[in-house]
Curated annotation (Swiss-Prot):
Annotated gene: ssh4
Location in or out of the cell: Vacuole membrane; Endosome membrane
Domain called B30.2/SPRY: residue spans: 146-342
Top-level taxon of origin: Eukaryota
Region Disordered, annotated ranges: 385-417, 448-507
Glycosites: 397, 450, 499
SMART domains named among the record's database cross-references: SPRY
Organism lineage string: Eukaryota, Fungi, Dikarya, Ascomycota, Pezizomycotina
Family listed: Belongs to the SSH4 family.
Protein name: Protein ssh4
Membrane topology label: Single-pass type II membrane protein
Gene Ontology BP terms: protein transport
Length: 507
């Protein structure tokens, strides 16, 4: 194919270019050489051919323009779709955030008669009043009086009305003692339970509860503690859970606001004094009940003998909960805050105790191991030296001084003024105050006794000889006045010289 033929309009649409070129150059010859058409004029055919060629040419140019227009239109549509999708995503995100913050900050304005999955929580005061009226009609006099007493206490002391956050001194005590900083403190006015060893609680015949001195911390993800029922008669009901302060401790936990408990009957109570909700198996002697608290979500759950039960409380993030145990009869409950291993394995592995087992305060050393301690060793040495010195003084000093007997009555100083008649004291006997002189004379005349004589008691058959000192007076102890005088040093030296010179004179 030649270049002129390739560049013809037939090359664009794939038509034979030679035929098209020949028709364009000499359309009349093409028509004359072809088969004659019936009743067709040559001019009309030529006009039709020209019209076809013009239409083909115009169609080719328009096709090129259409292709470029379609490509530019598709690009614009893609950009528009991307912008609209971005704006749509942003709008959806803003709408979701608006709904979230709306429900978060308007929760107090909503009223739920029954929250999902947690029946028995009253957010409507009218519903609570109706429930209260129905329950008071069927209560006996004792139960009604106890409930009204607790209601008065709650109205006078609303929950969380006192400061219960862990103070700096309590935090330092936890750092020093560890989990030993927690202990149960019974109410002295009730005095119906006895706490032994910080965590061993013994209840008596009437209804009461006991709380810990410190609340559950909120630094970790989960905190957990367990209570084991050591002794429980069939008629005694035990309630194990958590409460806030102040709380009426003459009532069981779970019966009033901001308290939750697992009852030994197998029910649970959450701010519910009238009706209990079935929760788990009943509790018997030897069972272990665990209480877990998640501060970040405000969730409280229970376990029984190492098996986790469903969550009871949700959203209690601002309250300070205190571990609480209550009973209405004689029983014994031992509580484990983390000083021992838990029955719940997950809490054991993840160390969900209230605090570490040991704090920074070292325990006291055992008896008999004072070595290495300067203070204890020095104290032991000083005590040994003092005891040895006293023993030596008792051995060397054989006499003791017996003080004179004093007359009964108050001891008066020499300067005391009394209205009693004074005895006449001659001036030559006492120049100053006579009492001091009399005391010195009495001290000088105090007899001395031998300690060995006091200790050695003679047998009944023994009789002291006549020349012995026993039974003699004080003059026997004095030296003999007729004995020769003791020679001086010079006289003794002179006598020795005379004795040495006498043998020489004999020779």
């Amino acid at each position: 194919m030649r270049g002129s033929e390739a560049s013809g309009p037939g090359a664009i649409f794939g038509a034979p270019s030679t035929l098209t070129t020949s028709v364009i150059r000499n359309p009349t010859s093409f028509l004359s050489s072809s088969t004659p058409l019936p009743s067709t004029d040559a001019d009309v055919v030529a006009q039709n051919v020209e019209h076809v060629l013009l239409s083909l040419t115009s169609h080719n140019d328009g096709g090129l323009v259409g292709v470029s227009g379609n490509s530019s239109g598709s690009t614009g549509k893609g950009i528009l779709i991307g912008v609209l999708s971005a704006f749509g995503s942003a709008t959806v995100a803003v709408l979701v955030l608006a709904i979230f913050f709306f429900f978060k900050y308007t929760r107090r304005g909503r009223i739920f008669l029954d929250r999902i999955g947690r029946p028995g929580e009253f957010d409507d005061e009218q519903a609570f009043a109706r429930e209260e009226a129905e329950a008071l009609e069927v209560m006996d006099d004792m139960s009604r009086s106890e409930y009204m007493r607790a209601k008065s206490f709650v109205e006078a002391n609303p929950p969380e009305s006192m400061q219960t956050d862990i103070s700096l001194s309590q935090f330092l005590a936890i750092q020093e003692k560890g989990v030993s900083a927690w202990e149960f403190q019974p109410e002295l006015e009730i005095a119906n339970c006895f706490v032994e060893g910080r965590t061993e609680i013994e209840f008596y015949d009437s209804e009461c509860s006991v709380q810990t001195n410190l609340p559950v911390p909120k630094q970790n993800d989960v905190y957990y503690w367990e209570a084991k029922i050591y002794e429980k008669p069939e008629s005694t009901h035990i309630s194990i859970g958590m409460t806030t302060k102040p709380y009426p401790l003459f009532r069981l936990p779970g019966f009033h606001k901001t308290s939750v408990a697992y009852l030994s009957t197998g029910h649970r109570r959450y701010n519910q004094p009238f009706s209990a909700t079935p929760y788990g198996p009943p509790l018997a002697q030897g069972d272990v009940v665990g209480v877990g608290y998640r501060p970040r979500s405000g969730t409280i759950f229970f376990t029984r003998n190492g098996k986790k039960l469903e969550d009871v409380v949700h959203g209690a993030k601002t309250q300070n909960f205190f571990p609480t145990v209550g009973a209405n009869g004689p029983c014994t409950v031992h509580v484990n805050f983390g000083q021992m291993g838990f029955v719940f394995i997950e809490a054991n592995v993840k160390k969900w105790g209230l605090a570490p087992m040991t704090g920074s305060l070292a325990p006291p050393p055992p008896y008999g191991s004072e070595q290495g301690s300067i203070l204890l060793e020095s104290g032991r040495e000083s005590a040994a030296q003092i005891s040895q010195r006293v023993y030596q003084d008792a051995r060397t000093n054989s006499t003791v001084r017996i003080p004179p007997s004093r007359s009964p009555g108050p001891v008066r100083s020499p300067t005391d003024i009394s209205l009693a008649p004074l005895a006449h004291i001659p001036s030559h006997e006492d120049v100053g105050e006579g009492s001091s002189h009399a005391n010195t004379i009495a001290d000088e005349q105090t007899p001395l006794l031998n300690t060995s004589d006091l200790d050695q008691v003679p047998p009944p058959e023994y009789s002291s000889p006549d020349g012995s000192r026993r039974g003699s007076d004080i003059t026997g102890d004095l030296p003999n006045q007729n004995s020769p005088p003791i020679p001086s040093y010079d006289a003794a030296v002179g006598n020795q010289a005379d004795n040495t010179s006498t043998p020489d004179g004999d020779h």
